[in-house]
Design a protein with these regions (language model features):
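Acidic, proline/glycine-enriched N-terminal capping motif
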Residues: 1-124
Length: 124
């Protein structure tokens, strides 16, 4: 399964707050990004063949390859961005649990055009 996101990924670390009653909630910056990214994923899910759409959320062990292009040359917190992506994929019901992800390849491509993030998820 391949997915594309057009915006930069914020760090997922410290993206969630805890209320006094113990409930967790997303902080404003992360929630804004997650809403936009979720909308992009939902538009892509609608175009999936019915057989592939019925297999969501993906189950079992997964391997993920991420091609990430930055708009600028600033340093990025890759583990934090991975956290944000795992939260997003779980939130949009692409995957059931981030514990399923057994392998990750993070690639900084030479491309200067196109989307910021290209995600390929492979089962098995």
């Amino acid at each position: 399964m391949k997915l594309v996101l057009t915006d930069q990924i914020p760090s997922g670390k410290n993206a969630m707050g805890v209320r006094r009653d113990g409930r967790h909630y997303p902080k404003a910056r992360f929630e804004s990004w997650r809403s936009q990214a979720s909308f992009e994923i939902m538009k892509q899910k609608v175009k999936l063949p019915l057989t592939q759409h019925m297999k969501l959320p993906l189950l079992g062990d997964l391997t993920v390859t991420i091609s990430y292009r930055t708009f600028d040359n600033t340093l990025r917190d890759v583990p934090g961005m991975l956290d944000a992506l795992w939260h997003l994929l779980t939130h949009t019901q692409i995957i059931e649990n981030d514990g399923q992800i057994k392998g990750v390849a993070w690639i900084y491509p030479w491309r200067t055009e196109g989307p910021c993030v290209e995600i390929e998820i492979v089962q098995g």
